[in-house]
Amino acid sequence: MSLKRDFISRVQKELKQVQSLRPHGIEVTLPSDSLQLWEAVVPGPEDSLYKGGRFKVQVYVPENYPLEPPTVRFLPPIYHINVSPSTGHVCLGFLTGENWLPTRCISDVLSGVFALLIKPEPENAADQTLLNMFHNNKLLYEAKARSSAQNRQDDLTAYI
């Protein structure tokens, strides 16, 4: 598969920028020679249920990026209404086809994931069961989310 020169140039520039700026303390690496697959470690925000956790996120950049949005997954999935419990796929409003803007960059995507840990988007829920708990038994939902973050303080190395 041959990637277009514009794609390569843009993605290399964005990678360099994210690695030097480290928005929100997010660390980014490429697990292989492919510019299409990024791995990031996202710290749990201090003012969130995920405080203290460190979460591995995989970003897949499609060939026609920036016309098409990247896809994002938590590996392993985290306990969050916007994350599929089975695949880790992140449901973030501005990553949907109709809301995606080609002027956005991968740094925006990672910042959006970080912000999602602070403020979930119920309108973009990935799982109906979690959404019901979020609305009907918020204390239990919050306890499970906190617990999942605590469990992720030490075991991140198993996934990197």
Q: Could you describe each region identified by the protein language model?
A:
Residues 1-160:
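UBC/E2-like fold recognition across ubiquitin and ubiquitin-like conjugation systems
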